[in-house]
């Protein structure tokens, strides 16, 4: 190989690396940075909602500020195992389903499960407490409406869903790959206890911060091992090691709460 050809390849590699870095650094989770969360709305015209939107997520969820609504009922979901890929966006690790991974029904509208994002620490807080991890299951209806189901985690036993994906997640930190085929992935492995949950209207938690998102946040906390969270953190860039957006104002929004009532057994 001639020296000029080698130089050309080095320049191309440098340019490619620079482009990838720029994509990853479009926004940061580090408060005080020029591209930090308080400035997202000023970085691009199409991200203006991040700064000016009135229904932004995440928010603080407090039991003493909710509207109890028993008509919500248990979640009507029907998930199925299907081929999926893992993608490293630089800001988070996500699972993207290639086929029909099943659906969630809200107000008689079917929302197809599309992808799952992971954020550590959690983005939502519950009664003043922030948790070690949050999984966000993004769903989409035929008319492009979106609904997100959120699971909060504390350190404890390993999460079975992430356990099946650990070997794939490791590859992100040991190679330059940003997309990996994960084979068949079963969303039913997720620890979803829908006997109690919060619901409110909000937004996506990363630019462009699109509003009109129906959020359902599980009240019961699941468990994840510290090692599993570490693997997720090692995969992303340094601006997203703690990839949780700061809490946003509730702005007079209603937060509804469902809890399944325990049946009472009467002695005769």
Curated annotation (Swiss-Prot):
L-ascorbate binds at residues 92, 117-119, 136, 205-206. This is Dioscorin DB3S. InterPro entries: Alpha_CA_prokaryot-like, CA_dom, CA_dom_sf, Carbonic_anhydrase_a-class. Its EC number is 1.6.5.4, 4.2.1.1. Keywords: Allergen, Antioxidant, Disulfide bond, Lyase, Oxidoreductase, Signal, Storage protein. The gene is DB3S. The active site is at residue 91. Residues 25-259 form the Alpha-carbonic anhydrase domain. Storage protein of tuber. Involved in protection against oxidative stress. Has carbonate dehydratase and weak trypsin inhibitor activity detected by measuring the dehydration of sodium bicarbonate and the inhibition of trypsin-catalyzed hydrolysis of N-benzoyl-L-arginine-4-nitro anilide, respectively. Contrarily, no carbonate dehydratase or trypsin inhibitor activity detected by measuring the hydrolysis of 4-nitrophenyl acetate or the inhibition of bovine trypsin-catalyzed hydrolysis of N-benzoyl-L-arginine ethyl ester, respectively. Expressed in tuber (at protein level). GO terms for biological process: carbon utilization; cellular oxidant detoxification; cellular response to carbon dioxide; one-carbon metabolic process; positive regulation of gene expression; positive regulation of phagocytosis; response to oxygen radical. It catalyses: hydrogencarbonate + H(+) = CO2 + H2O; 2 monodehydro-L-ascorbate radical + NADH + H(+) = 2 L-ascorbate + NAD(+). Belongs to the alpha-class carbonic anhydrase family. Not glycosylated. It comes from the Eukaryota. GO terms for molecular function: antioxidant activity; carbonate dehydratase activity; L-ascorbic acid binding; monodehydroascorbate reductase (NADH) activity; nutrient reservoir activity; protein homodimerization activity; serine-type endopeptidase inhibitor activity; zinc ion binding. Monomer. Homodimer. Disulfide bonds join 50-209. It comes from Dioscorea polystachya. Pfam families: Carb_anhydrase.
